[in-house]
Amino acid sequence: MTVRVGVIGTGAIGQDHIRRLECKLSGAKVTAVTDVNQDLARKVANTYAKQATVYANDRELIAARDVDAVLVASWGPAHEASVLAALEAGKRVFCEKPLATTADGCMRIVEAEMAHGKRLVQVGFMRRFDSGYLQLKQALEQELVGEPLMVRCIHRNVESAESYTTDMAITDTLIHEIDVLHWLLNDEYQHVRVLYPKKTKHALPHLQDPQLVLLETKKGVIIQAEIFVNCKYGYDIQCEIAGEEGVISLPDVPAVRLCSNGRKGTEVLQDWKKRFEAAYDVELQAFIDDGLKDEPASGPSAWDGYVAAVTADACVKAQESGREESIELPKKPAFYQHSAATPEQV
């Protein structure tokens, strides 16, 4: 059996997913593609998936009989409509973040999925599938350091694009930490405050960089998250969790250590693609496997997408107010209580 996938959006991430579906992963093939740029869609299909039909829009693709599952990798504001259409058609859907650009939009997807009666949505929070984060999760579940007390995270990029704005430090960058820490700690966020350190000379006039986000969970864990998107030296992701009995940290990315000319060191990655390439493979294979077995989606859920959106909204509000802001979430529906895969299952 093969899961026949229709891909909406053939930009950079869409192309990456088409390539991995066709060339790296098992149990799936790309049978349909669409993009607002039809010439690009045809070019991508001809390059990676010659058998795929190019459709004029997402609705035609979703309705196609040879599409079992939908992968949404289009412009963020278009995600909600595509996901809702896929749910209406009863087709499972993998949606790159954001699930929707508003918390209300995410809730509409949650409600539509619950009305359908089966988990069909997986959100593209790939860090949950990264081997390093899986090791952290396993260590926490085995209580190797006791109860978590504090978390320190770092998210650094070489430089930001001219279009990158201060709020995007939350909605585009910190959103990954928001989700993965919610999953790691199995705890809900309660309060947030955002601090602005001295601004780097490398940031454009409209951008505040770096930023420091302080999150507090309902269990009292304090999270210090640094976002520095013009650090210049490389792409650097770190996470350290201090518990009652010890400290655990995200392992370093394996790299050759070079000793030469009186210096010793390793290469620093320059972008996110290499850092999380394997995680992208694993998350999409999990989505395919769920489809092959006709089981509910086991990856990050629509509810997780909603939690991330509500938390991000509060963080942006804290950016603007300069004060501590509350993060208020309704009770998690029973529909989503026991749906996430454990590290052993992934």
UniProtKB/Swiss-Prot annotation:
It catalyses: myo-inositol + NAD(+) = scyllo-inosose + NADH + H(+); 1D-chiro-inositol + NAD(+) = scyllo-inosine + NADH + H(+). Residues 322-346 are annotated as: Disordered. Its EC number is 1.1.1.18, 1.1.1.369. Residues 322-331 have a biased composition (Basic and acidic residues). Pfam families: GFO_IDH_MocA, GFO_IDH_MocA_C. SUPFAM superfamilies: Glyceraldehyde-3-phosphate dehydrogenase-like, C-terminal domain, NAD(P)-binding Rossmann-fold domains. The keyword NAD applies. GO terms for biological process: inositol catabolic process. It comes from the Bacteria. One of its GO terms (molecular function) is inositol 2-dehydrogenase (NAD+) activity. Pathway: Polyol metabolism; myo-inositol degradation into acetyl-CoA; acetyl-CoA from myo-inositol: step 1/7. Keywords: NAD, Oxidoreductase. InterPro entries: Gfo-Idh-MocA_inositol_DH (IPR050424), Gfo/Idh/MocA-like_OxRdtase_C (IPR004104), Gfo/Idh/MocA-like_OxRdtase_N (IPR000683), MI/DCI_dehydrogenase (IPR023794), NAD(P)-bd_dom_sf (IPR036291). Involved in the oxidation of myo-inositol (MI) and D-chiro-inositol (DCI) to 2-keto-myo-inositol (2KMI or 2-inosose) and 1-keto-D-chiro-inositol (1KDCI), respectively. Homotetramer. Belongs to the Gfo/Idh/MocA family. This is Inositol 2-dehydrogenase/D-chiro-inositol 3-dehydrogenase. The lineage of its organism: Bacteria, Bacillati, Bacillota, Bacilli, Bacillales.
